[in-house]
Amino acid sequence: MTGPVSAQAGLDGDLKPTLSLYLAVGLQAGAVIALQLAIMRIFAVGSWAHFGSLVVSLAMLGFGLTSAIMCIGKRWFERRWRGIAGAALISFGPLTVGSNLLAQQVPFNAIFIVSDPMQKWRLAANFMLYMLPFLAGAFYLGIVFLKAGRIFNRVYFADLTGAGLCGLAFLLAMYFLAPEDLILAPLLLWLAGGVLWFAAFASRAGLAGLSAAAFVSIAGHLALPPLLDAPKLAVSDFKGVSYARKFPDSERIYERASPFGYIEVYASSYLHFAPGLSDNAAFTLPQMPANAYLGMYIDGEGPSGIIRDLPPEQTAYYRFLPMFYPYLIKAAPDTFVVQFGGGISTSVALRNSRTVTVAEGNPAVRDALRTDKELREFTGDVLNNPKVRVIDYDGRLFLARTSQRYDVIDLSLADSAGLSSPGGFAVIEKFSYSREAMASYMRALKDGGVLSVTLWNKEEPPKSVLKLYATMVAAARELEEGDIANRFFVAASYLSTATVLYKRGGFLPDEIRKLAAHTRAMSFDAVYYPGLEYDESQTAKVLDDYRKQIFSNAGLDPESAPVAIPAAGSESAAPETTDHPLPATLMGQLAWHRLILGGWEDVAQRYVFDTRPLTNTRPYFAGFVKTRDLPRVVDRLDLLQDEWGYLLLWATLAVACLASLPLILIPLIFGWRTIFRRNPGKLRVIIYFACLGAGYIMVEVGLISDFMLALSNATVSASVLITGMLVFSGLGAFYSERYLDRARRVMPKVFIGIGCMLIAYGLFLDRVLDLIGTLAYPLRLISCFALIFPPAFLMGFPMPVAMTSLARLGKDHMFLWAWGINGCFSVIGAALVPIVATSFGLGAVLVIAGGAYLLAIVGFFAVLLPLPGGLAPAHMAAVPA
């Protein structure tokens, strides 16, 4: 390690490059990103993940606020830079612990965010509290960037590389720290970085202050909550696990924390979990199985029912579950279960199949069922059953690559419990339900094989099930030309589940009769089968009633007048029936009628929600509210609780835009005469750094979602992207130094290279990732890193080249302002990604990001404009050529 910085730089001098400086910056940048991840995990376990994303996104505006303050008071900060940097660094730890502890004492309830104004203030309090440590981190990094302006590319390399590697370290820490203690991870990184910083300056006072702050922070986190009887992590009363904890005889029999989720399993006689179970089971079976389920909760969400190994005399119970449908017409089949979950589909399959292959991509779930003695005894050691073959990755990926064929393929309630969560759900990729995945399942069937897909059907008006219906029909049409009317059988239970059966080659008349008879015997609703009549005269009323249900106020919905929609596939309406199905059932029947016979596009346009099929580029059971209808629903959010995750993205985008505008303009307004009037090309500088901020974060966030297509696990995808993007960009930042003197000639080529690569990725990446997903997992990881490297490396050039150029030109105020612009538009870009993805697809995110980098060329040359007179201050290097 090199000698102390104090020996090389005076109080008012620039920082000199030392190993201590780079390590301190890297660790502190890592502490900031670890804090972001910790807060999001805290919200994921305590309330709902999208609220954590909202709070972190807005708290990161603290970087823009820091930039504005430092820009106005630059001289004051320069004179006191060492003291301010030290104070900001020391305060990061206590502020992290204090803000988190206080935030847990003012939890907000998503359920009442519309009806109770106090909930909005509680959400605002969380935002303000969590902003405090980010402000401290931003002041420290801002001071370092300002004083190290001439070597910005190297400091930026340390910042990005440190953040990437520390982000990976945080993911590893999730194996050892419970969610309520994850805040310790950023604290340890902060402490290590602080020691290096103060040791480099040989500052005993700084080390003493840091030691005291670290002791207070860590002791405060560990000791204060039990002393004050205050929770470290407050779990919402409306989370699934909260109900389980309150049962009188509740017992937690399993607990494990890992990057793949915080898993808890509870036992209770009050726990009843039977998805889609027919009501007829209670009075048909001689005896209902007692204590048949354990409740498995991942990050507090659930339960996923872990079913007991039933004795032979009780297995008639399986017949009343929707997963039983395919076994009515397939005897002793070879069965594939796409996702194990809690094992219900696997148990049904074991009772009725010759062989069973089951996939489970979450290693934490597999380990729990394979290694815990109590769970193994309860389930009959199902995953170690010699009749069961276990695939230890996503079933979707296995079926896409295998040459094996199956009689029955079952996809039941995979990752879909959150579709009716009272907190809404975030915009989460559901690749298992995409059109491409469904086509893979259908191809993996033997001739006459049956695909059975069961989804939660708890929404009124129906939303998710209509997307599922459209997706499965689109997949079937992709596989075979001509009439597909006899390929499907669909049944549903109101506000419970819906099951779609697809048979390769089509259902025989006897099979249709058998399935229909079972549907009646279970008191399920028949939604579609060949020959089921649908009364077309009801179409206009069904659509009109649903629009009125959402847009009930006069004048809100100009389209609400009844409209006659011509019958599809017939000249006249079907005869009147005496049955009066529920509106949701009618809507399902209408959907299938038009999907099979034609005219669905017209109905989908009229329907109140977006029902487009899921695809690999748009794999979302979210974003149901059509963009044009957003202004109409802001005063009736209580009707759209399951869309709050999506609607909050719009709120985040709006708040970020409104907050960013003054943060960008404040330095301009207060410093116009003394600071900015002499700086040429201000508008183009805004464009440049806005494009970099939005473009980079859109690529990073967008690729995390994209890579789940090949890696199948959100945690692995995030770790690969965070590490790969930041480390490779850091290498690019370091390498860019050799091109500073040729920036005017080289950088346009860099921007064109980035733009073309990102646009190409946007157009073709999903197909490449589909192929990568069929490789062995180590090869998948290597391939993903290889895909990240080219754009990420080049994306490391623009920021340090521009910032170093500003510093060398003596445009220090512009330097600080540009950093703030970049930070503000990073927040805006992050909020924009899921909105663009749900509306236009993940590919569009990368195309827009590529366009942003191409647009940045316009602003780059403004960055290189010298101050009037053409001379930089004497201590600065020459202007890049």
What residue spans do the PLM features occupy?
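Alpha-helical transmembrane segments of multi-pass membrane proteins
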Residues: 2-881
